[in-house]
Amino acid sequence: DGETLVAPSEMALTLSTGEVLGESPRVRSARRRAVTETIDAPLYRQSRFDAAYNELDLRLRGDYGILARAYDDGVCYRFYTERDGELTIVDETAQLNFEGDPSAYIPYSKTEIPMRTSFENTYEYAPLSKFRTQTVAFMPVLVDLGERGYVLYTESDVEAYPGVYLTYDKEAKGFAAVSYTHLRAH
């Protein structure tokens, strides 16, 4: 409906070489397309469903890019590279910022070592400004924007990657990803 639900938010990947994909990005090309496809889903309540989305492929200097998709009820993005060989990601910047102080359903890690969790927990409902800073949360997190709807913040396709935990960035007024590397260092 043309309404902004998420404030400007940063995203980047830091590689083991020290290079940061997403830092001062320079667009080489942008390609847009509208897609409608049928997806086979043998384990879903229906065996097939249609998905329609608008896609933006930003190719950036440095042989990498960001692929973003906007569906009727959600958006997603992913980094990709056009480089040969393997890359090692040592850190991730993934913010999700909001105007004002909306409330959210947040599952906090309640273990002494935050990354040792079964990802099962009760969700606490509170304004983002009341985010418990002495611990981290895990995904998904559901942000309540009142009559404007909800924003669900989650990750997908996590294989051979430790996943992301969340903390609250008071200055940016939103969630900031905390990687396994940061948690392990403390």
Short names for language-model regions:
Residues D1, G65-R69, L152-Y153:
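Broad, structure-driven detector of short, well-ordered beta-strand segments within folded domains
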Residues G2-L60, S103-Y108:
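A low-complexity, Ser/Thr/Gly/Pro-enriched, surface-exposed linker/loop concept
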Residues S9-T14, R69-V75, E112, E155-A160:
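A short, sequence-level motif marking secondary-structure junctions
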Residues E37-A51, I66-A70, N121-T135:
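Short linear motifs in intrinsically disordered
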Residues F49-G100:
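Acidic, contiguous internal or C-terminal segments within carbohydrate-active enzymes
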Residues L96-E99, S103, K110-Y165:
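Extended, low-hydrophobicity, Ser/Thr/Pro/Gly-biased non-transmembrane segments
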Residues T181-H186:
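Conserved small/polar residues in nucleotide/adenosyl-binding loops
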